[in-house]
Amino acid sequence: MTVECDRVGGVNLAQGVCDTEVPPPVVRRAIEAIHEGNNIYTRLDGIAPLREAIARKLERDNHLTVDPESEVLVTSGATAGFYAAALALLDPGDEVILFEPFYGYHLNTLLALRIKPVAVPLADGNWALDLDRLRAAITPKTRALVINTPGNPCGKVFSRTELEAVAALAEEHDLFVFTDEIYEYFVFDGREHVSPATLPGMAERTISISGLSKTFSITGWRIGYLTANPRWMGAIGYFHDLTYVCAPSPFQYGSAAGLMELPVSFYTDMAAEYQAKRDLICSALVDAGLTPSVPAGAYYVLADVSSLPGATAKEKARTLLRERGVAAVAGTAFFTGGRGENLLRFCFAKRDDDLKRACDLLRGAGRV
């Protein structure tokens, strides 16, 4: 879809590349680190300034206290953290529950490791947790749950009440909980991001995964992190080292500078900015006759595109690109069992001029 979008000169709202401006302190410190010679391998768990900055950030924003020496692992992106943790803690044949719609990387990682993903659908429309469905999906082979909050692709933000219910089941069945909190600062309309590890009884069983790719608009730098009980960190760190060695050294320094130097207002202002972007794209989708499911967080919108010609979501995506010049992802990428054929995902992490152009194209103005 990206290649075809480039060919026709359209606007790419398919990829979650986040091409907004990188905060100046992050860029400056990374460049300095390169010139200072910080271009070789780091410790497998990352440089001390970044681990310490992550620990301070977690205490301030997530109300989670961790030891930067024994409970923080800098990873080559959040996805690398998930891969290493799955390698370390799960076995072929284990079952792991994903909430649907899901992020495709989670599903494909489990499949690659011969672990069985079990999809538990969230309620259509408002994406509420169906506790009965979740309870029914747990079997003697269930080893873990994956919670992506705020979520890609639907912007689901799990409420504290929902997470407490999940935590109770995790305790009852002795399950790991893998979180993906990469969009933690992209939460709208006064909602609260709750880190599952902060709930009673969850610290030891939760593998908390996040990163700075989205927050600092550095998706190509591959800087993520993982926190967990020291009991699990040795094995997780071993598999991350075996697979990735370490996250890029100079980019670790740049990321640490961002965490240390940027004020709290940076994060609140960013949430307000992205809420405005969300409102802009949702308004354009409504005007185009494509009904959006307004996201509570993250920076994607799932929209009902049943009015577009085409028998499948991929055909509808091609129709939209051909007729309106806007690229989106087929909804079937986020569902099992043939669901999602009438859905497309749009990413609104774009510069304002690009997003405005996409909205104009969706409305039928200025077609390519």
Located regions from the model:
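N-terminal small-domain helix-loop-helix segment of the aminotransferase-like
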Residues: 1-76, 84, 133, 261, ...
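Active-site phosphate-binding strand-loop segment of PLP-dependent enzymes
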Residues: 122-191
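PLP-dependent enzyme catalytic core of the Aspartate aminotransferase-like
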Residues: 135-136, 311, 319-328, 334-368
